[in-house]
From Swiss-Prot:
ATP binds at G599, P600, N601, M602, A603, G604, K605, S606. Belongs to the DNA mismatch repair MutS family. It comes from the Bacteria. This is DNA mismatch repair protein MutS. The keyword Acetylation does not apply. SUPFAM superfamilies: DNA repair protein MutS, domain I, DNA repair protein MutS, domain II, DNA repair protein MutS, domain III, P-loop containing nucleoside triphosphate hydrolases. GO terms for molecular function: ATP binding; ATP-dependent DNA damage sensor activity; damaged DNA binding; mismatched DNA binding. InterPro entries: DNA_mismatch_repair_MutS, DNA_mismatch_repair_MutS-lik_N, DNA_mismatch_repair_MutS/MSH, DNA_mismatch_repair_MutS_C, DNA_mismatch_repair_MutS_clamp, DNA_mismatch_repair_MutS_core, DNA_mismatch_repair_MutS_N, DNA_mismatch_repair_MutS_sf. Keywords: ATP-binding, DNA damage, DNA repair, DNA-binding, Nucleotide-binding. This protein is involved in the repair of mismatches in DNA. It is possible that it carries out the mismatch recognition step. This protein has a weak ATPase activity. The lineage of its organism: Bacteria, Bacillati, Bacillota, Bacilli, Bacillales. It comes from Geobacillus kaustophilus (strain HTA426).
């Protein structure tokens, strides 16, 4: 047996081999040592000839949980089953690996999140620098293909897909493989076969492009090799181009917190969390897919909006749909289990219950006053023949196991009915025997029982043994308090009963497998139905949210006009409540392309910028938007740089991250894009940062023309409004009352007059002595406002070069010669721009004036020390404004 194990293990060196021995899966040698550690189970050993062989095992019936633990940690598990009956085997029972479970091929269990896809991806690079990406969710049968023009585009798409496992060729470079593992947190596997098979025509027969066919073939070969069975539920591959959707890189999605928050990386607090009023798992998955890829096709956007508007105003119909959808199980994954051959009777009951909801869904949708409703009704296929089959055949409450009987209804199969009658008649005879023997012996406690070891028996308690007539029974077993007996007649009836039950169970299993095979014929229809239900669920979710929060239908402008009246940040509004949220307007057109936003910290600049972007995203996925009125252009891309999440592990500082993200936006943005830049340049010295910020603003203004919201603390930059005709100043309002700053969270035209930095520090609860010292320093600095600023360090040219920030052709960003370039390229505006920094109303103040010695500060209290320690631990660069405000309240409470 060990030789058999070693032979099979050699074929799967990178996987844990779960080797079936009776009712256990056993692991041996290094697999056992490592599995015992990872699963925290007992490591033992068995005789292996010259030495003891390390061994551990898990029960067959509970193996799924252990397998999921290993898969979750990135391992693979090969399932090796006994493929012949041990009773008839000659020598060692024949065993084979029947499935290789990998991080990307999980089909069931807790490892599958209900409202998330579980993707396996195959990435194929080509000599011309393009990449073919094929990915599939084995649990649902979805397959998608796309061709990407560069590694940067491929990297962004891989992030959007979120694959658990990535398949590449075996000759892929080690450095690239390591980057895939580290960058995406995915397992990496290998497959070299990209040849095509006729059996895949149903999946990729319609794909004409050779590169996509190769990428798909790599994926499909890996699936066939690991799953070792037909995959009839794989759907025809969906081909798409990333240019047909709004583009957002992973940084932009994270900054906007579309599907997860910056701080916790969790779902709660994200836009997905807000929008998800879906009531089916299929709808939840589709919602995330829509959010990952907002549309740019106005006709399709309007189609969705028409549906949402109708459902929003049809309250009772919407509630009826929600009630019916709650009765729909995860049809996509049920179909996957049916195709896989591991669906049980309960799965088929869930499928039947889901189908029983479809007629009511069709009726409700068909009654909606909307032309598109008829098209959706056509896809809501009730599969009446399948419902009839399942209604006639499967018990309403079957057991979990498919090999213990009680699966099939009476009347479905005549032979099964005969077996059951024999078993039931036999059991009735047993009951009659018990009554007869009680009367004959006078022993009221006499009973006829059954166990698997002895079969049927007559049990008499010890006090009643004298009442048993001599020779009436044959003694079989002595217990502490009773004796068990048998009779020839009882054993004869037992044989008849057990034979009938055994044959009944065997026949039930055969009938169930045949029924499951019949269900497979409906897979394409069921998958079409599942997609229709998912779409209906997402649309009703949008309508429910839009109705609850008073969202409005967006209008779209072909003149690049953006008008948002009474706009709100949807997530912040939900958290704070509509009564506490301060709405704001935003107006942009061809003459007002850029908004330069100034104002103090915590006044709402970042929230304002985010809400504009989120309004655009929501509109382009077909949802109503949080505003009183919204007119929007259709954006092809959204770029953001909000906050700073330093990639220290990659040696990238805040400044480097700023420059990389600025470069990405500048290189790819068009006049139809939306750019959000929050305090660009703060990662380096003051003048360098200011110069960079001005240069970036000018470049976007002159060469790109994208709608841009640019927030800054460099008040000097507000003078750019005089030289850049399409730039306008706006500011976040704040006022002082009784020496305290009050943030109004209102955006108004014009530049801000103050930053209120010391007021913010005071709100944070910093020690009073520290605040007074800051005010003294500020007063001295203001006195020295006319003095020339000391050198504050040179710009990090190395970081700029590494970031590859270039504005035109190979022209490098050279702040020292910027004025000369402006004079040469734009003589009409050059003179105005050359003096922006010199003419700015707010000169930078020296941090090192000749100050008098500071007074001796009183010692800090224990509370103040604790608050300071807590303040030092805060990573402000990874906090949202709301989280920062909450932290300030905590510190303030600590100091009171």
């Amino acid at each position: 047996m060990i030789q058999q194990y070693l032979h099979i293990k050699a074929q799967y060196p990178d996987a844990f081999l779960f080797f079936r021995l009776g009712d256990f899966y056993e692991l041996f040698f290094d697999d056992a040592i490592k599995a015992a550690q990872e699963l925290e189970i007992t490591l033992t050993s068995r005789d292996g000839g010259d030495e003891r062989v390390p061994m551990c095992g898990v029960p067959y019936h509970s193996a799924q949980g252990y397998i999921e633990q290993l898969i979750e940690k990135g391992y693979k598990v090969a399932i090796c089953e006994q493929v012949e009956d041990p009773k008839t085997a000659k020598g060692v029972v024949r065993r084979e690996v029947v499935q290789l479970i990998t991080p990307g091929t999980l089909m069931e269990g807790k490892g599958l999140t209900e409202k998330e896809n579980h993707y396996l991806a195959a990435l194929t690079p080509f000599a011309d620098g393009t990449y073919g990406l094929a990915y599939a969710d084995l649990s649902t049968g979805e397959v998608r293909l796309t061709l990407l023009s560069s590694w940067e585009e491929a990297a962004n798409e891989l992030h959007a897909v979120g694959a658990r496992e990535i398949i590449v060729a075996t000759d892929s470079g080690e450095e690239w493989v390591r980057e895939l593992k580290e960058r995406y947190g995915a397992a990496v596997s290998y497959e070299d076969d990209t040849s095509l098979c006729d059996e895949w025509n149903g999946v990729i027969g319609h794909v004409a492009q050779e590169k996509l066919r190769q990428a798909a073939a790599r994926l499909l070969h890996y699936l066939v090799r690991t799953q070792k069975r037909r995959l009839d539920h794989l759907q025809p591959a969906e081909l798409y181009q990333v240019d047909h959707y709004m583009k957002m890189d992973r940084h932009s999605k994270l900054h906007l917190e579309l599907v997860e928050t910056v701080r916790s990386k969790g779902r709660k607090g994200s836009l997905l969390w807000l929008l998800d009023e879906t009531v089916t798992a299929m709808g939840g998955r589709l919602l995330k897919q829509w959010l990952d890829r907002p549309l740019i096709d106005r006709r399709e956007i309007e189609r969705r909006l028409d549906f949402v508007e109708t459902l929003k105003t049809s309250y009772f119909e919407r509630q009826e749909l929600r009630d019916r959808l709650r009765g729909v199980y995860d049809i996509e994954r049920l179909v996957g289990r049916v195709s896989y051959g591991n669906a049980n009777a309960r799965d088929l009951v869930q499928l039947k219950k889901s189908l029983l909801q479809v007629p009511a869904l069709r009726q409700t949708v068909g009654a909606l006053p909307l032309a598109e409703a008829d098209k959706l009704c056509e896809r809501l296929d009730p599969c009446e023949e399948l419902v009839d089959l399942l209604e006639r055949s499967i018990q309403e409450q079957p057991p979990l196991s498919v090999k213990e009987g009680n699966l099939i209804k009476d009347g479905y199969d005549k032979q099964l009915d005969r077996y059951r009658d024999a078993s039931r008649n036999g059991k009735a005879w047993i009951a009659e025997l018990e009554a007869k023997e009680r009367e004959a012996t006078g022993i009221k406690s006499l009973k006829v029982g059954y166990n698997r070891v002895f079969g049927y028996y007559i049990e008499v308690t010890k006090p009643n043994l004298p009442l048993v007539p001599e020779g009436r029974y044959e003694r079989k077993q002595t217990l502490a308090n009773a004796e068990r007996f048998i009779t020839p007649e009882l054993k004869e009836k037992e044989a008849l009963i057990l034979e009938a039950e055994e044959k009944s169970i065997e026949l039930e299993y055969e009938l169930f497998v045949a029924i499951r095979e019949q269900v497979k014929q409906y897979i394409p229809r069921l998958q079409t139905l599942a997609k229709a239900i998912a779409e209906l669920d997402v649309l009703q979710s949008f309508a429910t949210i839009s109705d609850e929060y008073r969202y409005v239908r967006p209008q779209f402008s072909t003149e690049r006009v953006l008008v948002i009246q009474g706009g709100r940040h949807p997530v912040v509004e939900k958290v704070l409540g509509a009564q506490m949220y301060v709405p704001n307007d935003c107006y942009m057109n061809r003459e007002r392309e850029m908004l330069l936003i100034t104002g103090p910290n915590m006044a709402g600049k970042s929230t304002y910028m985010r809400q504009v972007a989120l309004t655009a995203v929501m509109a382009q996925i077909g949802c109503f938007v949080p505003a009183e009125r919204a007119v929007l252009p259709i954006f092809d891309q959204v770029f953001t740089r909000i906050g700073a999440a330093d990639d220290l592990s990659a040696g990238q500082s805040t400044f480097m991250v700023e420059m990389l993200e600025a470069r990405h936006a500048i290189a790819h943005a068009t006049q139809n894009s939306l750019i959000l830049f929050d305090e660009i340049g703060r990662g380096t010295s003051t003048y360098d940062g200011m110069a960079l910020a001005q240069a970036i603003i000018e470049y976007i203004h002159d060469h790109i023309g994208a709608k841009t919201l640019f927030s800054t603390h460099y008040h000097e930059l507000t003078a750019l409004e005089r030289s850049l005709p399409r730039l306008s100043n706006v500011h976040a309002r704040a006022i002082e009352e009784n020496g305290k700053v009050v943030f109004l969270h209102q955006i108004a035209d014009g530049p801000a007059d103050k930053s209120y930095g010391i007021h913010v520090a005071e709100l944070a609860g910093l020690p009073a002595s520290l605040i007074e010292r800051a005010r003294a320093i500020l007063a001295e600095l203001e006195k020295a406002a006319g003095k020339q600023e000391a050198a504050a360090g040179r710009m990090d040219d190395g970081a700029l070069a590494e970031a590859g920030l270039a504005f035109q052709g190979n022209e490098a960003l050279d702040v020292g010669s910027k004025v000369e370039r402006e004079k040469a390229s734009r003589p009409s505006a050059g003179a105005a721009r050359e003096g922006v920094l010199a003419e700015a109303a707010f000169e930078q103040l020296s941090m090192f004036p000749d100050l008098a010695p500071a007074p001796v500060e009183p010692p800090l209290s224990s509370k103040e020390k604790k608050a300071l320690a807590a303040l030092k631990e805060i990573n402000l660069l990874e906090m949202t404004p709301l989280e920062a405000l909450n932290k300030l309240y905590e510190l303030q409470k600590l100091l009171k």
